[in-house]
UniProtKB/Swiss-Prot annotation:
The gene is mtnD. GO terms for biological process: L-methionine salvage from methylthioadenosine; L-methionine salvage from S-adenosylmethionine. Binds 1 Fe(2+) cation per monomer. It comes from Serratia proteamaculans (strain 568). This is Acireductone dioxygenase. The lineage of its organism: Bacteria, Pseudomonadati, Pseudomonadota, Gammaproteobacteria, Enterobacterales. The record marks 105 as: Important to generate the dianion. Ni(2+) binds at residues 97, 99, 103, 141.
Length: 180
């Protein structure tokens, strides 16, 4: 089940607010300009889904985002516990960073933890199957896929080159709870 935990960026041990209610999560995140919605990820994709199959299964959802925001491209990221690069990929995005464009993800399988650093607070969003999240460009954040990642998400871009991570050098992520 999706979740949101809000902390002060000075108190990583004491949550200020928590919820597993999708509507409450969406309302809290809307206040900081983050889009969070529950969509239907109801297609059977199999054990190791081919990206083309995932795209074809959810093209109608992609088309909706393109029509709304004018996004230019999309792809699929799929991580499994047996991925030889899982530790390298996990550690890469566990450091606080920004992107020059929105970070849009639609989780069609599994889960991941987005952590946003805004307005003196840390917003930890547990995204699971059916969750759409859009993190605004230049938002300081990190992402935890867990030690045994198991998710498939559609990524939507204005421009794939704009999705380069710009690391802040702040080690704040080390102080906050991880996915596992």
């Amino acid at each position: 089940m999706s979740g949101l935990t809000i902390f002060s960026d000075q108190e990583p041990q004491q949550p200020l607010w928590q919820s597993r209610d999708a509507q409450a999560i969406g309302q809290q995140l809307a206040q900081i300009g983050v889009r969070f919605e529950r969509w239907q990820a109801d297609r059977e994709l199999g054990e190791n889904p081919d990206p083309a199959v995932v795209i074809a299964a959810y093209q109608h959802q992609i088309d909706r985002l393109v029509a709304e925001k004018g996004y230019q491209s999309w792809d699929v990221i799929s991580m499994r516990p047996d991925n030889a690069q899982r530790e390298v990929l996990r550690s890469k995005f566990l450091s606080e960073h920004t992107h020059g464009e929105d970070e849009v993800r639609f989780f069609v399988e599994g889960a991941g933890l987005f952590c946003l650093h805004l307005d003196g607070k840390i917003f930890q969003i547990l995204c699971e199957k059916n969750d759409l999240i859009s993190v605004p460009a230049n938002t300081r954040h990190w992402f935890d896929m867990g030690s045994a990642p198991n998710f498939t998400a559609i990524r939507v871009f204005d421009n794939p080159e704009g999705w380069v991570a710009h690391f802040t050098g702040d080690n704040i992520a080390d102080a906050y709870p991880r996915l596992d």
